[in-house]
């Protein structure tokens, strides 16, 4: 069968993709989220307590649904990328890519030789349906949608070079880490940070690559989409639950909850 990755196809066509961030590390909630109507779900392996096995379980949980899973690795490590691709990850987000050299290494890790250095173990891999997909090795490289995160001042300085790397399908701006890198830790909504984010998005879009980010602020999400951002995560599962639970508990108390305001959006999470 030909290479098949609906998320990659949508990004290439610049069709806006609205996503939800999954940080609870449970396949049950991943499946619930798959029924919500989002275009994509981010299974987080960087800041959420996911490992290879829990990531596999999440992929299996959402597989019956049309929503597209994207997996964020804890780092752009070659052995880990090999394992993630083997368990069936087709859309991969790699954090903290600061240079074109790093971007090229990540691309190489997602390609089989001679184009790259990915180890060949497809016969025992979920990705090939355990060899039921007899043409898997022929189409595997084309099925990968590779996204890298630019989330430091250094990355923004090198953004044009990163975008120019062949094999990078999109660049995701990480607002929280970028804010910290700019000296505004915990304040991704700071005007200087927002100006940097919007400038970076324009650079990415001008390069022909897809731009993406995360924000729980609906107005800001729409602003990014209007700028031409293609893939935007608009909420985080654990925050949605925590805020709803706190609000419900507070509604039955005489005193307002001392917890953070549930309805206050964040430019980062």
UniProtKB/Swiss-Prot annotation:
Keywords carried by this UniProt record: Lyase, Metal-binding, Pyruvate
Keyword Ribosomal protein found: no
Cofactor (UniProt): a divalent metal cation
Site (Increases basicity of active site His): 86
Molecular function GO labels: aldehyde-lyase activity; metal ion binding
Presence of keyword Metal-binding: yes
Similarity comment text for this entry: Belongs to the HpcH/HpaI aldolase family.
Protein name: Hydroxypyruvate/pyruvate aldolase
Taxon lineage: Bacteria, Pseudomonadati, Pseudomonadota, Betaproteobacteria, Burkholderiales
